[in-house]
C-alpha cells in the first residue's frame, strides 16, 4: 500500500523522532531497524523508502540536531544584540549547551556521532575525521 504525501511526511517525521529518541537512550549500535519501524507502525521494508540504511537515519538525526543548534545560536545572538561581541558569543554557546543538556543529544554526539558519520556512504571520503 502506497502512502499519501501527507502520510509520507508524517511517517518521515515520526521515524526521525524515534531515531533521535533511540540515539539518546540506546545508541546507534543497539538500535535496530525493526525497533524503529515497530515504534512508528510501518513494515521494515517501508523504512527503506525513507532511508537507505539505519546509519543514514542516524545521520539525519545529526543533521537535524545541527540545524536546531544553529537556530538556537542564531536566536541567542539576536537576543543579545547590543552586547559586546564576546558576550554575544558566550550567550550563543551557553544557549547551545543548554539545549544539548535539555534534549540529551550530547549523549548521542559523544557516543555515536563519529560512527554515524563514518558509516554513511562516502562520509569518510568527503569529510575525513580527525584521529
Feature map (PLM): residue ranges:
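Basic, helix-initiating cap at the start of DNA-binding domains
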Residues: 1-26, 33-39
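A short, mixed-charge helix-start or loop-turn motif at secondary-structure junctions
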Residues: 1-4, 51, 78-79, 118-119
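Short, flexible helix-adjacent loops and helix caps
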Residues: 2, 27-28, 70, 74-82, ...
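Conserved acidic
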Residues: 7, 11, 61, 81, ...
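Helix-turn-helix
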Residues: 22-56, 60
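Hydrophobic alpha-helical connector segments
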Residues: 60, 74-103
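Short secondary-structure transition hinges
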Residues: 98-131
Amino acid at each position: 500500500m502506497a502512502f499519501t504525501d501527507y502520510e509520507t511526511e508524517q511517517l518521515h517525521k515520526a521515524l526521525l523522532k524515534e531515531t533521535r529518541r533511540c540515539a539518546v537512550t540506546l545508541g546507534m549500535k543497539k538500535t535496530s531497524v525493526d525497533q524503529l519501524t515497530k515504534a512508528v507502525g510501518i513494515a521494515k521494508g517501508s523504512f527503506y523508502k525513507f532511508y537507505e540504511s539505519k546509519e543514514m537515519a542516524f545521520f539525519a538525526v545529526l543533521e537535524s540536531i545541527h540545524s536546531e543548534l544553529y537556530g538556537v545560536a542564531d536566536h541567542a545572538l539576536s537576543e543579545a544584540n547590543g552586547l559586546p561581541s564576546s558576550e554575544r558569543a558566550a550567550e550563543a554557546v551557553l544557549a547551545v549547551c543548554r539545549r544539548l543538556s535539555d534534549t540529551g543529544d550530547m549523549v548521542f554526539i559523544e557516543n555515536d556521532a563519529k560512527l554515524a558519520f563514518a558509516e554513511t556512504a562516502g562520509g569518510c571520503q568527503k569529510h575525513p575525521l580527525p584521529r
